[in-house]
Amino acid sequence: MIAQLVIAFYFIVCVGIILFNCFTEIISRYRSCVLKRREQRYCEEYRQLFLENITENKKQEKRLVKEFHSTSRLLTFSEALYKVENSMPEQFQQGIASVSRLMEELIPVYERKSDMEKACLAYVFAIFHMTKFQAKEIVFPFLFDLLGNKSLYCRENALRALYSSEDIHAVMQALTFLDANEQLLPHEKILADGLLSFDKKEELIPLLWKKMSEFHPRMQVSLLDYIRYASSNWKNEMLSMLETSQDMEIQIACVRYFGRYQDERSVPFLLHHAEEEKEGFWELQNACISALAVYPGPQTLEILKKEISSKNWYVRRNAAKSLAVLNTDRDALADILQGNDRYAKEMLEYQLDAVKAQKGAGL
């Protein structure tokens, strides 16, 4: 009898838990649906207001600023702007300047909010290039304050907003600030990719070269990576840095530049370091071997064939890849393809097939 009561009790508890879970799931889905419809309604309302020129109606303007104190409403507004930008680019360009100046009024409010909410405001400024139209004396102090924030989201979005301002001196000031506070410096890729969104590249890069020696090596590497993707016009400066720098990471960044833009003056350095097997410097050797893929010649062929048998897997792989990219005749590679080094043979065959497949696919 007791056992039956215990089983019945557990059965009732289990049914209760199942019913509770079903009820909460229904409520959750209902709330999600209601919120989604509300957001869509707000989005359409904001889109219409933007097209009617928000700033012409002062009463409407004040109401919107108050609504945008809510981060969710701010992001809904950004979604509406995104739709206008994609569907009606001309109307967007006509109205974004006045809206950008309106958004300045949110800065004192968001300065008192959490880091994530501050980052959201900077994000909206960045994606619509609002900082181009805003008063620098109002928006820049806010962005530079975010730049010193411990939150990566704040720093990244502040940088993006500064890049979108198209103000070269503000960008240089931001880079100098990050260099002076190295613990705040974001990952090299974040910094380089962000700088690529800055439109005035050919005006910015000379200023970077002018101050390059004043930056820390880590910052220099990020800037050299940026220059590699941004312009082919700096071979002399890159060559000088390649030959004079003693920092391996900086040398690797320069080597990658010459792997992207051919310059025969870099070949002696590439050949020397591709062959040099110094302990702790295999990354530089690896970068040189990879760069040699665009410098055909008997010395290149000889070194690559030698390094395909390297003890280092990365060096071996890049040597095989460079040989394949050079479109070397298979007869010239017969000593490897028919040799006793099974690992070198398999690696080379794999890379030859991969390059052939890429060419077949038009890549």
Segments (PLM) and residue ranges:
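N-terminal signal-anchor transmembrane alpha helix of single-pass membrane proteins
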Residues: 1-39
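Structured extramembrane domains adjacent to transmembrane segments
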Residues: 105-130, 134-142, 151-160
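Short, Lys/Arg-enriched, disordered terminal segments
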Residues: 1-6, 275, 349-363
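Structural detector for internal amphipathic alpha-helices that build alpha-solenoid repeat scaffolds
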Residues: 79, 87-97, 119-132, 156-166, ...
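Short inter-helical turns and helix N-cap capping residues of alpha-solenoid HEAT/ARM repeat scaffolds
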Residues: 113-115, 150-152, 182-185, 215-216, ...
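Amphipathic alpha-helical scaffolding segments comprising HEAT/armadillo-like alpha-solenoid repeats
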Residues: 61-65, 97-111, 133-146, 168-179, ...
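N-terminal topogenic membrane-targeting module
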Residues: 23-113
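Short amphipathic alpha-helical segments that mediate assembly, nucleic-acid/protein binding
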Residues: 47, 61, 74, 235, ...
